[in-house]
């Protein structure tokens, strides 16, 4: 390695947002990544207690039944933690910031806007919003003062991470990360596995106790651990399961949490809806796009040399030239402010 590279820093070391980076910038976490410890304990604690109890019962009663139950619990727990890690440790779709506003982003003066902002250059005034065509619908995109760009459709600036993020759904404190374009499928799988694990532990805790002959209260007192685990999972499944059902509804209608609360697409025409099967195919079977930023790259030597990202190119990369078209001025379609 040259002495010049030794003096330079990588992008993750100078990134101005609040993310936490590990393994030399290979793992990207949110600023509240420490909350993962609580989530891990809430899932792992009951799962480990249940597994230990099943292992104990293998040598005491119904060994075949409890052996299969133990294997199922271990598999579900492993899957839940795998998807949790994949959700929390990857770039969710962070959009590169502009050091300056490129000419491609300066809209025509005919663009209608009631509010104008001054870029960091101080010499260029930009409208606060401009129109973008998405699948025949006009969508308003906002200018982000922090990132110095017009956000792509469905993008949002997360105040917790201080990044503009592609197809932003929400910032989840339980995983300590934004849920967005590049980790949403893993998040849904994590919720699904957690829900199944809750149901699994609840059902087999009670089935295991019911296999013991005698008064229910006597059996419960004799195996209090399984009783407590069953009650814990019964309460938990209403929260985790409800969230899982809600996100499957969002997938069916091709909405994000942010859009559902802000724009109520269930009462309006949704420009992104493609039908239930196509919506699921787009989420779970389409290739996850590569990150727009390689945080392990060397940071530019001269701050003025590099414009880290241009919204015109990002729109094409994120949505494809057939789906998105820049437009100046108003359209007759209903404009949705983004």
Curated annotation (Swiss-Prot):
Reactions catalysed, as given in the entry: L-cysteinyl-[protein] + hexadecanoyl-CoA = S-hexadecanoyl-L-cysteinyl-[protein] + CoA
Region (Disordered): 319-338
An MF annotation (GO) of this entry: protein-cysteine S-palmitoyltransferase activity
Keyword Membrane: yes
One GO cellular component term noted in the UniProt record for this chain: endosome membrane
Highest taxon of source: Eukaryota
Compositionally skewed regions (Basic and acidic residues) per UniProt: 320-338
Active site: 172
Pfam families assigned to the protein according to its UniProt record, in alphabetical order: DHHC
Subcellular location(s) per record: Endosome membrane
InterPro entries on file: Palmitoyltrfase_DHHC (IPR001594), PFA4/ZDH16/20/ERF2-like (IPR039859)
EC number: 2.3.1.225
Membrane protein topology class: Multi-pass membrane protein
Keyword tRNA-binding included in the entry's annotation: no
Keywords tagged on the record: Acyltransferase, Endosome, Lipoprotein, Membrane, Palmitate, Transferase, Transmembrane, Transmembrane helix
Domain DHHC: 142-192
Bilayer-spanning residue ranges: 32-52, 68-88, 186-206, 225-245
Family: Belongs to the DHHC palmitoyltransferase family.
Domain remark in the UniProt entry: The DHHC domain is required for palmitoyltransferase activity.
Chain's role: Palmitoyl acyltransferase.
PANTHER family recorded: PROTEIN S-ACYLTRANSFERASE 1-RELATED (PTHR22883:SF284), ZINC FINGER DHHC DOMAIN CONTAINING PROTEIN (PTHR22883)
Protein name: Probable protein S-acyltransferase 1
